[in-house]
Amino acid sequence: MLPSLQSLSKKVLAKQCIPVDQYHILKCCGLWWYDGPITFYTYRNKMFIKSTCFSEGIELNTVLMKAAKENNHDLIRLFVEWGADINYGLVCAHSEHTRNLCRELGAKDRLDREYILKIFFDTTRNKTDSNIILCHEMFSNNPNLKHVDDLDLREEIMWELRGLMEITYMLDHDNSFSNMLTKYWYAIAVDYGLKKAIHYFYQKYTHLHRWRLMCALFYNNVFDLHELYEIERVRMDIDEMMHIACIQDYSYSAIYYCFIMGANINQAMFVSIQNYNLGNMFFCIDLGANAFEEGKTLAIQKENYLIADALSLKHYNPVISLLSAVTDPEKINSMLKNYHSKNMVVFLDYERR
């Protein structure tokens, strides 16, 4: 739809840095939301809105969804005139009155499955605290997602969280779609180190404390791991923790932390072999893993002959500098930031001969 002169004027005003003593002008113009001014800006050809409830900035289409959920018709009209896709609003329009307004402004009568999936993943793309919290609020328990077969979205989420979702049997047996979505947002927050979002989920979903611990292990987030294990006292079996840490390759910080806490380093090497993680396997050897014959047998069973050949050598030794019991995440990260396995170098030198 073509923007009115009034909405264009508001857009220009929303781009300005308005002094606090002139905030009454913004209130009169409808540029006020959650006790704060609405600011408009563009970044990399995308339109964003800032307000007190999302100070980091949220894409205009996503903000439209929040306005629709709140039945804020003035802001719906304004955001659409500024260039938002009204179909995003329809996804979160729960009242008939708001749905009718969306259709008056050009929304489709009904969004098909592919379009809803596109909206879902486009909205999730911006990995900030404000956006992930807002995504959770917009999509969780959203009756309009019933238009999408749960299996479609489940399969997409399972693919995005492949490896992590496969071990949820260690946690709980709540496989509801709503619980899966919450786990999805929580995992993104831990993966990207979004502290505000992590705190939000931690306070709101106490039954998912161990899920956060699993995410910290899986995504090699040693800061979150230390906070949960040492400060918040969230507990799991230490060898189960090590198992999760070994699923993704080069998870040195999480593996080291579990090792210092008493995990079996030979079992960690076996998990690394099962997952074809050469980097993790050699790091376990650096930490003292020495069950080479058992590891070689496992590698042959997995038809991973490169690992089997590597474990045939007899020249590996623990790296003494790694054996000091460091649990401070800052020191662990500093120690392992540019770490290269000494024993992997031994193997590579042998291969070059």
Curated annotation (Swiss-Prot):
Transmembrane segments: none annotated. Plays a role in virus cell tropism, and may be required for efficient virus replication in macrophages. In addition, inhibits the phosphorylation of host TBK1 and IRF7 and thereby negatively regulates the host cGAS signaling pathway and antagonizes IFN-mediated antiviral activity. Coiled coil: none annotated. Belongs to the asfivirus MGF 360 family. This is Protein MGF 360-11L. ANK repeats lie at residues 59-88. Keywords: ANK repeat, Host-virus interaction, Inhibition of host innate immune response by virus, Inhibition of host IRF7 by virus, Inhibition of host RLR pathway by virus, Inhibition of host TBK1 by virus, Inhibition of host TLR pathway by virus, Viral immunoevasion. One of its GO terms (biological process) is symbiont-mediated suppression of host cytoplasmic pattern recognition receptor signaling pathway via inhibition of IRF7 activity. Interacts with host TBK1 ad IRF7.
